[in-house]
Structures are given as C-alpha cells and as structure tokens.
C-alpha cells in the first residue's frame, strides 16, 4: 500500500491536483479537524470532493478520527505546546481511539491513499504521524510525501 501525504498550502490548484493525479492516488483522506479552510478555496470540503471526484476520478473521505482534538490544535497554534509535546499528546489520542484497529478495519484493502492536511511540509504536521501509524499497522506500507 502507498500512503501519500499532501498539504495544500503553498500549492496552487494545478500543482495540487496534478500531484494527486500523476501519482495515481485512489482516495484522498482529509484528516483535518475542520475541512472548511479559507486558506485555499479549492480545499474546502464539498468543493474539494467535487474537484477530486469529477475532474480527477479520486474518491474523497473526510475522516476526523485521524484529527487532533480541538484543544490540542488550538494550544499548538497558540504556541502553548511545543511540537514535541504536540506529537506525544497526538499519539496518546490516537492510542485512546484504538487507531491501529480502526486502520485495519477501514483501510487495509486500499491500494493508495493520500492523507490531506493544510501544512505545506510534513515535518510538523499530524499527517506524518498518521502515516507512520499506518506503516506500523499494515504490511508493506510505503510513505510518500508530495
């Protein structure tokens, strides 16, 4: 299984959709807590779903099971917690949600998915953490950051 990750900031629509299409992504899994971002018009939930399905033949799922809690996200954005503390707390949240079992049940039969969040780079984004959990959970997972 290929687990791609992508952030939509610092990408225009052409680059964003071309990366997904050119890498044969089958399903975009939007793991944002809120998918109505004002950062890029093409990345709003219903619009994004329309563009992906109609123009790229890519399925779209908004799955907040992989999202941080509102409190953790707010604390990180307001610099009340460091990235290291965010990462630790996020992983604890995933454990409490039995995320590995959830992945096995809901995503084990996928060929290729792309985890979507807003951050331009994966280094300090929860999509990287989720991709790593996929790799620990399923056999032969290849992580590719777009």
Please provide the spans of the model-predicted regions.
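Residues lining hydrophobic/aromatic ligand-binding pockets adjacent to catalytic sites
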Residues: 1-146
């Amino acid at each position: 299984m290929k687990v791609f990750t992508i952030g939509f900031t610092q990408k225009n629509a052409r680059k964003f959709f071309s990366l997904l299409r050119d890498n044969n992504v089958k399903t975009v899994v939007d793991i944002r807590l809120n998918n109505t971002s004002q950062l890029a018009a093409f990345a709003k939930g219903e619009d994004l779903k329309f563009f992906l399905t109609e123009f790229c033949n890519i399925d779209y799922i908004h799955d907040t099971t992989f999202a941080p809690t509102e409190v953790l996200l707010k604390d990180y954005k307001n610099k009340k917690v460091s990235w290291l503390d965010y990462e630790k707390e996020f992983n604890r949240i995933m454990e409490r949600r039995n995320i590995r079992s959830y992945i096995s049940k809901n995503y084990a039969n996928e060929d290729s998915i792309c985890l979507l969040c807003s951050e331009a780079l994966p280094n300090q984004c929860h999509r990287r953490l989720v991709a790593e959990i996929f790799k620990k959970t399923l056999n032969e997972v290849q992580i590719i950051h777009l």
